[in-house]
Amino acid sequence: MSIDPAGRVVRSTVSPHSETRRHAPIRTFLHTDDGVTIDSVYDPPSFVYEASRPLARDLVFVVAHGFTGDVDRPHVRRVVNTFTRYGAVVTFSFRGHGASGGRSTVGDREVLDLAAAVSWARGLGHTRVATVGFSMGGSVVLRHAALYRPEADGHTDAHADAVVSVSAPARWYYRGTAPMRRLHWLVTRPAGRLVSRYGFRTRIHHRDWDPVPLSPVESVPGIAPTPLLIVHGDRDGYFPLDHPRMLAEAAGDHGELWIEPMGHAEHAVGDELLDRIGDWAGTAAG
């Protein structure tokens, strides 16, 4: 499966433009360009009530979770709670995850899910959008940033102003670690997809990619001049350090690489690192 990067994102059915709505949480279903319903949550910034934080009402983080995550997972909510100290946060469950419709394509058509969430965030009145993705979500934010450019016709409401990719792969079909071999079994085997559905609440599409989408490392050169931060753990059990280094090399001068003392994705990222990411995004998003 692949996507047609042309075409617009279908908006949520909620009326989002009221300033009052930006002060209260919202939960709704968005509709992607290919008709999938996406469970989505808006959390207003906590510093509306917290005088110690700088005012940045126009900044919103759009968080893309990892494979088998969803908006209600505790590790996703912890990320949200930290980022609300720097701006509003939109989270969503990728297709095939949680209460969202469809089936997971493990990073291919998920760019449409992210585009719908970014468009919704802008519709709520936020003028600066930082996308932050973890693991599979980290690959999605990279591909999304390359496909949805500020100057491209039809994509001006779905582009990111800053991009943070945490624990992302650089290339597809990597099986060099035991966790990735297990993941490939989940995705490619009927028995694995049953385990994923009933054990991890993740419904995976049975079809192979056709054509194979552009890989993260192939996408990165198309992100410039949008600021890019690549974050990776030195103890990541899924993707070794050659992955972030490949991404950083592809980014050149417009990318920044942080190698951190941690493992993989949302479960491993600490509050101090999330604070630094929040600071970086607030500055980089302009």
Where are these regions (language model features)?
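The alpha/beta-hydrolase serine catalytic core
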Residues: 7, 13-18, 24-28, 38, ...
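Short beta-to-alpha linker loops that shape the active-site pocket of alpha/beta-hydrolase fold enzymes
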Residues: 67, 93-98, 169, 263
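A short loop-to-beta-strand scaffold at the N-terminal edge of the catalytic core in hydrolase folds
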Residues: 33-53
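Primarily recognizes the serine-hydrolase "nucleophile elbow" in alpha/beta-hydrolase
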Residues: 120-181
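Short beta-strand element of the alpha/beta-hydrolase
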Residues: 57-66
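The serine-hydrolase catalytic nucleophile loop
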Residues: 67-80
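Alpha/beta-hydrolase active-site loop
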Residues: 105-124
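Conserved alpha/beta-hydrolase
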Residues: 80-101
